[in-house]
């Protein structure tokens, strides 16, 4: 099986200068769509599951599904990642069920709603890093709170999102604090806050530097050139997908996502992992709506799901090609987690923060 840790994959991405989209999964159809896209362009992939996805699909089902995908597509390096873990138990149970990487989001407290202070974030993230590295699993941390610079609010997704009004000091990661955070927590990747948010309704207009602070990414990369940065909430919310949904009975108000060209710019400034969920949902549900309206007599779920899978596959392939991930799968020789654990223990994988 071709399961790979996040650390090894992002190390390779940094060496070769590309980024890796991280696609969220809830079911078999999404998994197949992602892997078909990866096979079509010889790309490694990150598949991630939120706590909501784990509850929806069941940990055992998800674990067996990932085993199956790795067996069906043995040539594709596949990282299975826990998205937005809220405490140590969430992260450790993910590893127990076969995840090769976890995110400990200590920017919020365990309720996934209350913004946490810096010391809390450092303490819990460092504990998860220490435990995960024992077994060779990778850890992503988060510094700063995801949310809109326009509204000062965060968008909840799968029960995860800050409540109340947030100021810019919370919504933008401080570069100097980022250095201290990486040094103290030993994370393998750092999710930063730059004005992006979960869901479809990210921006009320095409984003510029006032509401999408790419300058923050640049500043952090200058201070932490060897740290893998992560952009969350980075769906582009394509106009054509909004139009398909609304043409077939949907009622999505006009909205704007993170432009692909801005993500590509971020990749040049150290962004190695790019979280994408909403775009995949829109690609699939647009086809559900189309088929329901065009063929109202249809009742075979496969007649809905196959076109939806194809649409998501095409979306994923576009992102893999745009981010430079395409053509990289065959260049990677996977390091087993046991060997990664030895490298962590030796200090060889300690972050460079000087």
From Swiss-Prot:
The keyword Metal-binding applies. It comes from the Bacteria. The active site is at 83 (proton donor). Gene3D superfamilies: Aldolase class I. Zn(2+) 2 binds at residues 105, 142. Coiled coil: none annotated. It is an enzyme of class 4 (lyase). Binds 2 Zn(2+) ions per subunit. One is catalytic and the other provides a structural contribution. Its EC number is 4.1.2.13. The keyword Translocase does not apply. GO terms for biological process: glycolytic process; reductive pentose-phosphate cycle. Its cofactor is Zn(2+). D-glyceraldehyde 3-phosphate binds at residue 50. One of its GO terms (molecular function) is fructose-bisphosphate aldolase activity. It catalyses: beta-D-fructose 1,6-bisphosphate = D-glyceraldehyde 3-phosphate + dihydroxyacetone phosphate. Pathway: Carbohydrate biosynthesis; Calvin cycle; Carbohydrate degradation; glycolysis; D-glyceraldehyde 3-phosphate and glycerone phosphate from D-glucose: step 4/4. PANTHER family: D-TAGATOSE-1,6-BISPHOSPHATE ALDOLASE, D-TAGATOSE-1,6-BISPHOSPHATE ALDOLASE SUBUNIT GATY-RELATED. Catalyzes the aldol condensation of dihydroxyacetone phosphate (DHAP or glycerone-phosphate) with glyceraldehyde 3-phosphate (G3P) to form fructose 1,6-bisphosphate (FBP) in gluconeogenesis and the reverse reaction in glycolysis. Belongs to the class II fructose-bisphosphate aldolase family. This protein is encoded within the form II ribulose-bisphosphate carboxylase operon. Homodimer. This is Fructose-bisphosphate aldolase 2. It comes from Cereibacter sphaeroides (Rhodobacter sphaeroides).
């Amino acid at each position: 099986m071709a399961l790979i840790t996040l650390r090894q994959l992002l190390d390779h991405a940094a060496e070769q200068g590309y980024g890796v989209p991280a696609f969220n999964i809830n079911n078999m159809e999404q998994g197949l769509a992602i892997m078909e896209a990866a096979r079509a362009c010889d790309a490694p992939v990150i598949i991630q599951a939120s706590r909501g996805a784990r509850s929806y699909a069941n940990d055992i089902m998800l674990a067996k599904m990932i085993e199956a995908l790795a067996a069906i597509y043995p040539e594709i390096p596949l990282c299975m990642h826990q998205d937005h873990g809220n405490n140590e138990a969430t992260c450790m149970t993910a590893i127990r069920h076969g995840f090769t990487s976890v995110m400990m989001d200590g920017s919020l407290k365990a309720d996934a709603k209350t913004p946490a202070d810096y010391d809390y974030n450092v303490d819990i993230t460092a504990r998860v890093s220490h435990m995960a590295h024992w077994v060779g699993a990778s850890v992503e941390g988060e510094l700063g709170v995801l949310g809109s610079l326009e509204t000062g609010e965060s968008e909840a997704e799968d029960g995860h999102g800050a409540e109340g009004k947030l100021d810019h000091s919370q919504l933008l990661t401080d570069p100097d604090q980022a250095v201290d955070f990486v040094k103290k927590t030993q994370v393998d990747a750092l999710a930063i806050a730059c004005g992006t948010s979960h869901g479809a309704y990210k921006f009320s207009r095409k984003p510029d530097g006032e509401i999408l602070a790419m300058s923050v990414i640049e500043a952090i990369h200058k201070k932490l050139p060897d740290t893998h940065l992560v952009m969350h909430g980075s769906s582009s919310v394509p106009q054509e997908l909004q139009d398909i949904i609304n043409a077939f009975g949907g009622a999505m108000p006009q909205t704007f996502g993170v432009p692909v060209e801005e993500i590509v710019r971020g990749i040049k400034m150290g962004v190695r992992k790019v979280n994408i969920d909403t775009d995949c949902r829109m690609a699939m549900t647009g086809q559900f709506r189309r088929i329901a309206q065009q063929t109202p007599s249809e009742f075979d779920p496969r007649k809905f799901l196959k076109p939806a899978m194809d649409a998501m596959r095409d979306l994923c392939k576009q992102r893999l090609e745009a981010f430079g991930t395409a053509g990289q799968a065959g260049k990677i020789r996977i390091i087993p987690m046991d060997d990664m654990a030895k490298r962590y223990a030796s200090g060889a994988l300690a972050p460079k923060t000087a």
